[in-house]
């Protein structure tokens, strides 16, 4: 597995923060780093396989990657990321207690993926741009300024994540997308789902298309197919069982959609013919 080293990304040995844009981010094999990072998805779509679990990522997704996590990107479509790198929560010169603002693992579950709305993403970009402007300066005031900006970024993300802000339709759409990650195999009635998240059906269609480039049903089908592909690679269940477990009532229809999406049949994936990035 590829290991990325801080010496290749941080501008100096005492720099606590570095900015690494990926515009765009191509498919990239599984790797880990000797530093931490906050991955901010600017726009586009892709699959982020994080510690073996696939997540659909779109504009507004924020992922917190620790130095022992392994991850990869695949099936990317104009996926543009900004990575905010930091050595460790306890390796800042002027900041302490940052762990309290970061996601915490509870009962073996690590809430690695958050979502923010478009207006918050604009504020995030401004903070990151300010950090980039000062990246070449190594004096104490510049170091302190970068670390303060990093703290502001963490505060903004925490306050604005879907877990704490459901006041507008964009935030409710983010919550809906997170709900679909957990309920992709359910029979989805879009009228009922729109009501559940206090959105009109028209608003749901318009905003989801703006954010993902897909209609709601197309997005759900892709999500189901991504989950199915993961199971084909990492479980012994039959193709038919996987189709049913991922929300498809007809395995033949599932196979047709699968081949259309990935240009490989489920059997091809099961046998590793697609040359899956390891």
Curated annotation (Swiss-Prot):
Taxonomic lineage: Bacteria, Pseudomonadati, Pseudomonadota, Gammaproteobacteria, Enterobacterales
Oligomeric form and interacting partners: Binds DNA as a dimer.
Keywords (A to Z) from UniProt: Activator, Cytoplasm, DNA-binding, Repeat, Rhamnose metabolism, Transcription, Transcription regulation
Membrane-traversing stretches: none
Domain HTH araC/xylS-type per the UniProt entry, residue ranges: 174-272
Entries under SMART domains matching the protein: HTH_ARAC (SM00342)
Keyword Methyltransferase part of the UniProt annotation: no
One Gene Ontology cellular component: cytoplasm
Keyword Cytoplasm: yes
A Pfam family: AraC_binding
Protein name: HTH-type transcriptional activator RhaS
């Amino acid at each position: 597995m590829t290991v990325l080293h801080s010496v290749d990304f941080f501008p100096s040995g005492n720099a606590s923060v570095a900015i690494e844009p990926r515009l765009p981010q191509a498919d990239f094999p599984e790797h880990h780093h000797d530093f931490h990072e906050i991955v901010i998805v600017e726009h586009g779509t892709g699959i982020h396989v994080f510690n073996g679990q696939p997540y659909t990522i779109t504009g507004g997704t924020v992922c917190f990657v620790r130095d022992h996590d392994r991850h990869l990107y695949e099936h990317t479509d104009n996926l543009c990321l900004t990575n905010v790198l930091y050595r460790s929560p306890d390796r800042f010169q002027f900041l302490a207690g940052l762990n309290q603002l970061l996601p915490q693992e509870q009962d073996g579950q690590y809430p690695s993926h958050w979502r923010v709305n478009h207006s918050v993403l604009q504020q995030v970009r401004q903070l990151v741009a300010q950090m980039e402007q000062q990246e070449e300066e190594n004096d104490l005031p510049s170091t302190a300024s970068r670390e303060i900006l990093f703290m502001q970024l963490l505060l903004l993300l925490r306050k604005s994540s879907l877990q704490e802000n459901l006041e507008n339709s964009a935030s409710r759409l983010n919550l809906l997308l997170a709900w679909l990650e957990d309920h992709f195999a359910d029979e989805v009635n879009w009228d009922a789902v729109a009501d559940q998240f206090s959105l009109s059906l028209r608003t749901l269609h318009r905003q989801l298309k703006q954010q993902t480039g897909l209609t709601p049903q197309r997005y759900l089908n892709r999500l189901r197919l991504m989950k199915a592909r993961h199971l084909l690679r990492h479980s012994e269940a039959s193709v038919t069982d996987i189709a049913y477990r991922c929300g498809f009532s007809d395995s033949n229809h599932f196979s047709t959609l699968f081949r259309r999406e990935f240009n490989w049949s489920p059997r091809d994936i099961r046998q590793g013919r697609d040359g899956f990035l390891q």
